[in-house]
Amino acid sequence: MDTIQKVFKKLSIFLVFAMVIGLMTPGVVLAKNKDYKVELDYGDGYVTVYKGNKYGIVNDKGKIIIPIVYQEVIRDDIEYTLRYNFFVKKGGKWGLVNKHNKVLIKLQYDSIQWYGDKHYIVSKKDKRGYVNYGIINFNNKAVLPFKYSDIRELYGGWAPVKKGKKYGFINDKFKTIIKPQYDFVSTYLSDGYASVAKSGHYGVINKKNKVIIPFEYDSIEQMNFDDGYIIASKSGKTGIIDTKNKVIIPFEYDSIGAVDLENGFICAIKSDKYGYINKENKVVIPFEYGGGNKFTEGLAGVSKDGKWGFINKDNEVIIPFEYDDAWGFSEGLAKVKKADKYGFIDKTGKVIVPFEYDDANSFSDGSAYVEKGGKTGTVDKNGVFTPYED
């Protein structure tokens, strides 16, 4: 089971020392003579730092708020909680403290992972040395007993659990709704449906354990019940079926990526080349590219000879192949990468936001989230960077 190590860590950077007493430079400021280094700047006034092999938290003034005594410190920063609590590990055991280092969950677990609002998946070994998983609440009370060999995160009101060698499901009230009986549960939970495996084959069930798609596939690679399709594989080839198990795209491709059934463009791979087919399985763009993305706003990013550009639906090159990576258009701009920096271009290839950002998201509501020199903020369509306030 994935544990707290699922949380993403960024590349370490050295903290900037305060050069003049009283002068507050943007970003994290350290008092003089501090010899700890930055592990991760959250961009909102909290920074994981380390000294030797011990970790703690400082604020943007360089004040230590979580002592540098832990083996690991990772914020419980699931975006919809934002409680400013921290998972900490000491003596090989995990627990939870708040930003004042008050212990909220005693350091007694072998792993700890966010489950749902105010609940955590935790594990501990029994007397025989076997690892058992349970769920505790914010008061450290077990709401699901330690009798499972795997528990996964809650999604759409249900969560996979494993007992012995079989998987079943619990609901958001921690009640068993499907007894453990499946060999495997994929990560694809969609609108009340789950891809599960039995006797070496995959199918799809609903929350009432009714079989929606029979167990006849080697894998279920993607499910989208809203748009009515499922990407599956059979006999080493990939195709698309609908939610009634009717074949939409025959099983003849190495892989299928971006799907847009409504507009008739499906990105597929054949003989290690990317191309596009329509929902009648007719090739609309030849299999000649090294990579391909979904069409957005009339254009798709594709790669050739290691560089990315954009084509239209007639396979005409609109933006030349000169980027290291490319993403879809949003609000008229596309995120592209060049020389390890991110910028944004318009549909003519004109650079609108220069290549000076270390990370970036696509535009939404007139701005895009970006990171620059350890600072996070937004950039607008005029290229103006606005850092987040501490």
Question: What is the meaning of each model-derived region?
Answer:
Residues 30-390:
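Residue-level detector of conserved, function-critical positions
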